[in-house]
Each structure stands twice: as structure tokens, then as C-alpha cells.
Regions:
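Short, glycine/acidic-rich beta->alpha junctions
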Residues: 1, 24-25, 41
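Soluble small-group transferase modules, centered on the S-adenosyl donor enzyme superfamily
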Residues: 39-142
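Short hydrophobic alpha-helical module
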Residues: 15, 36-39
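Extended hydrophobic-aromatic, low-complexity segments
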Residues: 21, 30, 57-59
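A short glycine-rich, Lys/Arg-flanked "PGG" loop and its adjoining helix->strand segment in the class I
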Residues: 1-15
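Conserved beta-strand signature within the Rossmann-like core of class I S-adenosyl-L-methionine
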Residues: 16-23
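Short alpha-helix
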Residues: 23-36
Length: 142
């Protein structure tokens, strides 16, 4: 992930297309995605970003997730308490949008606008500075 890679992804997306990726909890990676694309959300330790503002369709999300399978195994089996609780928690994410009382590590949805206001300015990740790939192992910091 870097400004240059985000720009490459943007060039392959249709206008309004959405890119979703893992930021490994790096605030610099989150800010890089939000600043490069301009619109989006942090979803736990991922960002979902676009060149256009977009709204989350919770009913569509509910329908898609209820049928979601991996290798034929239902990810949210409604017949188990655990599956139902997981499903309800994830489907409820949009209701907690930008909720300042939710701890950072919790299941959370935050708009890019909120993220950029909440976090201190940081050097964006580029192909030349490699972000945490170089800083963390060598310096122990982001």
C-alpha cells in the first residue's frame, strides 16, 4: 500500500468503484488511503475507499452476508447462537459510524472525514518510504 499503488488501483476502477484493503492497524496506511482516494471508511483495521462519496446499503449488506460462504461453508450460520451473534454484530456496524465511545480496537466503522480529523498528520506511505515495512522492524515505531 502506498500513494503510488493507490493511484494505480484508482486508474483501474470505474468512477465510484470501491477498493477495500487491510491497513494492519497502521494510521499512516489509513490516512494514505483516505487522502489518496478522498472518500471512504475505516472498517476495523481495513479501509474501503473510493474517488466518490458512497453510502452503505445495510439491507443489501444483510442479504449478501446472510448467504456468504467460503468453500461451501456458511460464514454466519443462523442456526447457531455464535453465528447469529457474529452476524448481528457485523450488520450493526453502520449504526456505530463515527461513535467516539467505541474503543479503537473494537468492531468499528469510521468515516475518512472522522479519521482524518481524529488522527495527527502523518507522512503518507509512498513507494520511496515504504511506511511501516521499514520503520517498525528497524525503529520499533510507525
Amino acid at each position: 500500500m502506498s500513494v503510488e499503488f493507490d493511484q494505480l488501483i484508482k486508474s483501474h476502477l470505474q468512477t465510484g468503484g470501491v477498493y477495500f484493503y487491510n491497513t494492519t492497524d497502521s494510521v499512516r496506511a489509513e490516512r494514505t488511503g483516505c487522502e489518496t482516494f478522498g472518500y471512504g471508511y475505516r472498517v476495523m483495521n481495513h479501509v474501503m475507499v473510493s474517488d466518490r462519496a458512497f453510502q452503505l446499503d445495510t439491507e443489501r449488506w444483510r442479504r449478501v452476508l446472510s448467504g456468504y460462504t467460503i468453500d461451501g461453508i456458511k460464514m454466519f450460520p443462523a442456526e447457531t447462537t455464535e453465528g447469529k451473534e457474529k452476524f448481528d454484530r457485523i450488520v450493526a456496524l453502520p449504526s456505530a459510524l463515527d461513535d467516539k465511545t467505541t474503543p479503537r480496537g473494537a468492531l468499528k466503522l469510521e468515516s475518512c472525514d472522522s479519521l482524518l480529523r481524529r488522527t495527527p498528520p502523518a507522512t503518507l506511505i509512498t513507494d520511496d518510504n515504504m511506511g511501516t515495512e521499514w520503520r517498525w522492524p528497524l525503529l520499533g515505531r510507525e
